[in-house]
Amino acid sequence: MSAFTPASEVLLRHSDDFEQSRILFAGDLQDDLPARLDTAASRAHTQQFHHWQVLSRQMGDNARFSLVATANDVADCDTLIYYWPKNKPEAQFQLMNLLSLLPVGTDIFVVGENRSGVRIAEQMLADYAPLNKVDSARRCGLYFGRLEKQPVFDANKFWGEYSVDGLTVKTLPGVFSRDGLDVGSQLLLSTLTPHTKGKVLDVGCGAGVLSVAFARHSPKIRLTLCDVSAPAVEASRATLATNGVEGEVFASNVFSEVKGRFDMIISNPPFHDGMQTSLDAAQTLIRGAVRHLNSGGELRIVANAFLPYPDVLDETFGFHEVIAQTGRFKVYRAIMTRQAKKG
């Protein structure tokens, strides 16, 4: 993570302005500028575990990962630099949380790509920190204001839920498929066999819908769920609890925190990281699966039909099969045999 994003490049045009500032970086932190910008002091708060991994290596305890920031996370900061995500409710959750903790008078900078909808920040913060656009470059906007009034923040008000075949799915801003079951997951679910047994790992679990739906018709499976997103981890825990399903849920960058082997790994892997297209997570998932599958175990994933996963599956497992497809999606299946590279 050495190349800077367009948003960071815009901030670097103003680097002299930040040398005396005690800065909290937050939002969609796609690079390590928070660790490298010359400031009086720097902290970072992120809801993304993989971003925290990169930043914590350079910033130590000054980089924090959690769903909700606390007073300790913003201590002594006089400036907020917020990277706008592509998801407006996610931005609202994070900004209301952070502005409720920062003292009145804090300098507020919001930066983001124009296509992400960053201009909405002016409207969102109008009652708390009126913003003005201070720069426009690299197809990004940079906005500045000063905190005049702290909002009241209640994380519980951001919870949502929807029903799928009698199951209740709990969601939070920033969780994939927040408003209903996506078509890809639906296709993957249609391929799962009732009365399955064994240890199942759900990678990139989102709100936990794949796991609870699987557990309903295969109650003897033992579930482990992981995701890079703090909102997803909390949403999955809530979804499991609401539906009376047991399982372990934790934050992990694909397999980074996963221990042991499983009889089945299921996933609807992401191919976007913020505004950027990224196949890294899915390729890491496929290549790393052989280190976490028992002999005869199975990797089953759903993906957009145009994505180049068949080659990686064949290279890793020796073969693959397509067990369901629509015009847009394919469900791939690969079995752990002697042909598979053992990683």
Swiss-Prot record:
Q: What is its EC number?
A: 2.1.1.172
Sorted alphabetically, which keywords does the UniProt record give?
A: Cytoplasm, Methyltransferase, rRNA processing, S-adenosyl-L-methionine, Transferase
Q: Where does it reside?
A: Cytoplasm
Group of enzyme by EC: transferase
What does the record give as the reaction this protein catalyses?
Answer: guanosine(1207) in 16S rRNA + S-adenosyl-L-methionine = N(2)-methylguanosine(1207) in 16S rRNA + S-adenosyl-L-homocysteine + H(+)
Please name the HAMAP family in this protein's record. 16SrRNA_methyltr_C (MF_01862)
**Job of this protein:** Specifically methylates the guanine in position 1207 of 16S rRNA in the 30S particle.
**Name of the molecule in the record:** Ribosomal RNA small subunit methyltransferase C
